Regions:
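Catalytic cores of nucleic-acid endonucleases
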Residues: 491-493, 501-507, 511-573, 577-578
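P-loop NTPase nucleotide-binding core
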Residues: 42-43, 48-182, 188, 194, ...
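Helix-loop-helix "sensor" segment of P-loop NTPases
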Residues: 224-274
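Short amphipathic alpha-helical interaction segments
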Residues: 364-385
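Short, amphipathic alpha-helical interaction segments positioned at domain boundaries
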Residues: 319-320, 402-435
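Sensor-1/coupling segment of RecA-like P-loop NTPase cores
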Residues: 172-182, 187-193, 200-229, 241
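Walker A/P-loop-proximal flanking segment of P-loop NTPase domains
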Residues: 1-72
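Winged-helix-like regulatory helical subdomains adjacent to P-loop NTPase cores
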Residues: 284-371
Length: 589
């Protein structure tokens, strides 16, 4: 190998010092790729909202497959990576690019030479000559230059079909194993360019010798239109990826702050993660903005200030405005798409009132627009994950992304209402500066995040009873969900710090972290009342009640908890649990 050849086949973006909590997906796709040698791996989609780290996962798995196998082993799994572009000149250009990309990846792996992946370093004619003459490549693979030549000469029927079938043809004929990683898979169908290869993909993805792992940035198009119907329906297993949990969002926040040398208090880190909805991109953007402004993040007020700046003119603004404007350009049939998207974001509730939007269009823009036209535009917006469309119920709602919704309000004032950009940004900073603090007990909230992650890590396992002051070990169920700060009724005492739902078994947990103050019987009784609310609301057979008191408990509280079967943990107990499930201990504040 050339000494200057990098130790990666495809460059990743996130620094190792920062990368957080995607190990499950890295291992899952790596192991599934290796398992393809046994012909037991199904084509799989990694499905999730934008900016959740899907592309990074694919790149890291590809690099691992590239370097951690013996490339000379005929049973080695050959990784191929391709990202579908947003615009396609014609079918000939696509077929040429797809076939050449496959040739480069296959040859680069088999010869362990990453320089073959670069068209700038290794020109096409040199690649063709190498493949045609190298003794270390299979005779079947050596025929690929012939296909490339016929495509370049436009002397082949259905070039796009021949292109996407090529990896399977090689693996089937050689009885070898190839795994194809396809990013931006929603771009297999681009109506505005009269480009659609979805139908041809069916034959390609069904081969046990050549499973395809796909992902993309438009979740709705992928799930509903490309994989959820038509020729590819039922051909893919699904691996959903969600936002980071509170614990790992907190960990990422701390890592990014250290990387960018931003002062960050332990207490505010989980609040940054929560306000960003656990989205890695948003978290990183806020920390980078703080670094740019030389602003320490020490409380909610400083966090709000950074959110206001970044939403209106920073990294988040640049990313989301590009995303929104590109999608609107793609679908703008009526000249009213921007207005409808903006007015949808202004709706007070989560559900969008179409009649109100119709009325607002008339009042604000003087346009008479039918309900059917508005629905049609909303459906198109939902395809770009800008609106949530419940097709079975026939109603629309805001997307579950509070940062995006807040951005759309600012974007609409500037881009749609044409208000003064500087004034809008200044108003947003004022609004965010005056926001009421959402979390009064920052230390208690931090502990809740750790408690929730303990439950998630311990699913289907037992935890030592001693850490709950119980004689027997505690069996933890598989949870449908574990939520923080969930409210199941009116009044302040109906909010659960931690609520885990596991069908007939429910968990309710409380956290108290107040310096010099032990938890007493009153707090225990309030928690027991909350548990009863959960029992009735969820019709539960079993409700596990768990109380964390950082400063400990009064004698009376311990007596009551023993009588009522309440699990309880001190700081030392919680640290013991964190050690047991291999998480870092609570920070010392």
């Amino acid at each position: 190998m050339n000494l200057h050849t990098p130790k990666w086949a495809i460059k990743t973006i996130v620094p190792e010092e920062v990368y957080t909590d995607r190990q499950y997906f890295l291992d899952s796709f790596y192991e599934a790729a290796l398992k393809a040698r046994t012909r037991r791996t199904m084509s799989t989609v990694l499905l999730g909202q934008r900016r959740m780290g899907k592309t990074e996962i694919f790149k890291r798995v590809v690099n691992r497959l590239f370097f951690e196998q013996d490339h000379r082993d005929p049973d080695a799994v050959v990784p191929i990576y391709y990202s579908f572009p947003e615009n396609v000149t014609d079918k000939w250009h696509f077929a040429t690019k797809y076939v050449e990309n496959f040739m480069r990846w296959y040859a680069a792996f088999r010869l362990r030479d990453t320089q073959l992946l670069s068209a700038e370093t290794y020109e096409r004619h040199k690649l063709i000559e190498l493949i045609s003459n190298h003794r270390g490549l299979s005779e079947t693979f050596k025929t690929t230059p012939n296909l490339l030549k016929t495509i370049l000469e436009q002397d082949v029927t259905l070039p796009e079909e021949r292109a996407v079938w090529l990896p399977r043809r090689i693996s089937d004929y050689d009885d070898s194993t190839i795994v194809v990683f396809l990013d931006e898979f929603q771009n297999t169908r681009l109506p505005q360019y009269h480009f659609d290869v979805v139908g041809y993909m069916q034959e390609a993805v069904e081969s046990p010798t050549c499973p395809h792992f796909v992902t993309g940035s438009a979740m709705s198009i992928l799930a509903r239109e490309i994989l959820g119907r038509g020729s590819l329906f039922g051909r893919f297993d699904s691996e959903p990826i969600e936002a980071l949990t509170g614990y790992f969002g907190t960990e990422l926040t701390s890592k990014v702050a250290k990387y960018y040398q931003v002062t960050l208090t332990e207490e505010i880190a989980p609040v940054v993660a929560e306000r960003c909805g656990g989205n890695p991109f948003y978290i990183t953007a806020i920390i980078r903005q703080a670094a740019k402004q030389k602003q320490a993040l020490i409380d909610e007020s400083t966090l709000n200030a950074m959110l206001a700046v970044d939403l209106s003119s920073g990294f988040i603004w640049n990313e989301l405005s590009d995303q929104v404007n590109r999608w609107i350009e793609r679908i703008n049939d009526y000249g009213i798409t921007k207005w409808i998207l903006y007015l949808s974001a202004l709706e007070e509730g989560d559900e969008i009132d179409i009649k109100r939007i119709q009325q607002q269009l008339k009042e604000r823009d003087g346009q008479e627009v039918s309900i059917e036209t508005i629905k049609e535009v909303l459906i198109k917006l939902s395809r770009g994950d800008l609106i949530d469309y419940k097709s079975f119920g026939g109603w629309f709602g805001k997307i579950n992304d509070p940062i995006l919704v807040d951005f759309l309000k600012v974007w609409g004032k500037i881009e749609v209402e044409r208000q003064d950009r500087g004034m809008v940004r200044d108003d947003l900073r004022q609004e965010y500066t005056n926001l009421k603090l959402k979390i009064s007990d920052l230390k208690g909230y931090l502990a809740e995040i750790y408690m929730a992650q303990i439950l998630l890590n311990a699913q289907r396992q037992s935890l030592p009873g001693k850490y709950f002051h119980q004689e027997n070990d505690i069996q933890v169920p598989y949870f449908t969900y574990v939520r923080l700060r969930e409210r199941l009724g009116p009044g302040k005492d109906s909010e659960m710090d931690v609520h885990g739902g596991a069908g007939a078994e429910q968990w309710v947990a409380e956290s108290k972290w107040r310096a010099g103050r032990k938890a007493g019987p009153k707090e225990i009784k309030i928690l027991l009342d909350k548990a009863e609310i959960v029992r009735k609301d969820r019709n539960a057979d079993i409700v596990r009640v768990w109380f964390f008191g950082h400063e400990g408990f009064t004698v009376e509280a311990k007596t009551l908890m023993k009588e009522q079967g309440v699990f309880w943990s001190t700081r030392e107990d919680l640290d013991g649990l964190l050690d047991h499930v291999k998480l870092r201990r609570l920070p010392k504040l």
